[in-house]
Regions:
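An N-terminal-biased, well-structured beta-alpha scaffold segment characteristic
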Residues: 2-106, 110
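Short, ordered loop/turn segments at secondary-structure junctions
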Residues: 8-10, 38-40, 76, 96-97, ...
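Rossmann-fold NAD(P)-binding glycine/threonine-rich loop
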Residues: 98-124, 264-315
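Adenosine-phosphate binding glycine-rich loop
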Residues: 118-119, 124-161, 167, 288, ...
Length: 362
């Protein structure tokens, strides 16, 4: 029984789904691995490093697909790749079902089982497979680094003979995995950090990292049973906007991370709020692909509004692909270990297993 993986479009996606470390782990389950030639050369990982642990290489992606029962991907297959997929094979990756619904339906017509790992249930048994957490954590970190690069001022307070440099002030909107890492990173770099979230329960997490929590008074519970944020009422949005009017005038950098699963990102910073920031300030919108939290944010653009930089560069994983690939590949290995039956020597699609049933595209 073979697991395969092919090269992504490197200009758009630098991550890989299998590293030499996870290849060794997958093979230890009793599986074979097929990879496309020069699979991770762009990351400085040579084919020999894979071959040393028992991986077989093919010259073309179609050969890999034809010789593999399960295909690991990072992103949704291209139209050309879909044509080469075998019937009754298995596809695992991050496929953004709401965005790629038609493409995924086309694949399922070929009797292919698709598992999209961003649909994993939030249960303890699935934590080692949680691709959203592993990748969002890195995105939150990198968003702070990129914002500071664009800020053009020092971040920590510095006391010098020439005078005192004040600490930069950073506001994080959304205190999920990406937001909490953004808080921690900005704090370590010496910034004064505050954060806000629709979930009142996140107050303790923000404060544990040294951030100040900006609380919007609310009566409704805006947290799902799975711990995600829910859509807020118009009354709540008005209160949130009033709170942010004061915050936007004081902060130098804003990191936007607020998302609602299966829905467009909530628009939290309108044109008026963006323009309240000082000239030279920076807004990084991590939610830009889902519609964006901030006005003026556009995918893969840096827009300058009244001297304020609004950054919408997507897929920050391309800025640290080695680390992102390492974590993602480990997530995939954990999923395969759960899916593969050593006794049957085959993949076991057990719909009574919540991990399998929730991630399977039907």
């Amino acid at each position: 029984m073979s697991v395969g993986s092919i090269k992504e479009n490197i200009s758009l996606e630098k991550r890989v789904a299998i590293t030499p470390e996870t290849a060794k782990n997958i093979i230890s389950l009793g599986l074979n691995i097929n990879l496309e030639k020069d699979y991770a050369n762009h990351l400085g990982i040579k084919d020999k490093q894979y071959e040393d642990v028992g991986v077989k290489f093919y010259n073309s992606s179609s050969d890999v697909i034809n010789n593999s029962k399960l295909i690991l991907k990072v992103n949704c297959p291209t139209d050309q790749e879909i044509k080469t997929l075998k019937e009754k094979s298995i596809l695992v990756g991050i496929f953004n079902p709401s965005k790629n619904e038609n493409k995924l339906k086309e694949i399922t017509k070929k009797n292919i089982n698709i598992f999209s790992l961003e649909l994993l249930p939030r249960i303890s048994r699935a934590q080692s497979m949680d691709v959203l957490s592993s990748q969002s954590n890195l995105a939150g970190y990198r968003a702070v680094i990129e914002s500071i690069y664009e800020f053009e001022k020092a971040v920590p307070m510095m006391m010098t003979a020439a005078g005192t440099v004040p600490a930069a002030k950073v506001l994080v909107i959304g205190a999920g995995v990406a937001g909490l890492q953004a808080i921690a990173t900005a704090k370590r770099l010496g910034a004064l950090v505050s954060a806000t979230d629709v979930r009142a329960a996140s107050k303790e997490q923000v404060e544990s990292l040294g951030g100040k929590f900006l609380m919007v008074e609310q009566e409704d519970n805006l947290e799902t049973a799975g711990g995600y944020a829910k859509e807020a009422s118009e009354e709540f949005k008005k209160k949130q906007s009033d709170l942010l009017k004061n915050a936007m005038t004081k902060n130098d950098i804003v990191i936007c991370t607020a998302l609602i699963p299966g829905r467009p990102a909530p628009r939290i910073l309108n044109e008026e709020l963006v323009k309240l920031m000082k000239t030279g300030s920076v807004i990084y919108d991590l939610a830009v692909e889902q519609g964006g939290n901030a006005a003026y944010s556009e995918v893969d653009k840096i827009n300058i509004i009244n001297g304020i930089k609004v950054i919408g560069i997507k897929n920050l994983m391309n800025k640290l692909p080695l680390t992102a690939s390492s974590l993602y590949a480990k997530n995939l290995f954990s999923f395969i270990r759960n899916l593969y039956s050593k006794e049957k020597k085959d993949f076991n699609i057990n719909l009574e297993d919540e991990i399998i049933s929730k991630t399977l595209i039907k």
